């Protein structure tokens, strides 16, 4: 079996039969991905957190929380507001578990 240095794959192998841990890891992974996506898109648009907040009618600390991978309060409606302000659209896909 080939070695891997992918942390998610290693954790998955260690907890293969523990569905609760698998779910926690999946949620943490999604939160991190959403936070990174918001951050990268804002930076590419050349906006500060405060400027993006102004575009969607909120305050800078809200954007800071959304860009924090540990934040668990992401919502699709807020993501849609951010996408619209940055001239993007939200796409959601479900894929098979490998």
Set out the residue ranges of the language-model regions.
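N-terminal flexible/basic segments that precede or flank functional cores
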Residues: 1-33
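Short, conserved glycine- and acidic-residue-centered signature motifs
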Residues: 31, 72-75
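Helix-turn-helix DNA-binding elements, focusing on the entry/boundary residues of the two helices
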Residues: 38, 49, 60, 76-79
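Short glycine/serine/threonine/alanine-rich loop segments
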Residues: 47, 58, 88
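Recognition helix of helix-turn-helix/homeodomain-like DNA-binding domains
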Residues: 56-72
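DNA major-groove recognition helix of helix-turn-helix/homeodomain DNA-binding modules
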Residues: 76-92
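Short, charged recognition helix plus adjacent turn
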Residues: 94-98
């Amino acid at each position: 079996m080939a070695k891997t240095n992918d942390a998610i794959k290693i954790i998955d192998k260690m907890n293969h039969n523990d569905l609760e841990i698998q779910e926690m890891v999946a949620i943490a992974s999604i939160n991190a991905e959403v936070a990174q996506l918001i951050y990268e898109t804002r930076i590419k648009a050349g906006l500060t957190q405060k400027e993006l907040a102004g575009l969607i009618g909120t305050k800078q600390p809200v954007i800071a929380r959304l860009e924090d991978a540990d934040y668990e309060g992401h919502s699709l409606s807020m993501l849609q507001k951010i996408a619209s302000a940055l001239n993007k659209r939200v796409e959601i896909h479900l894929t098979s578990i490998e």
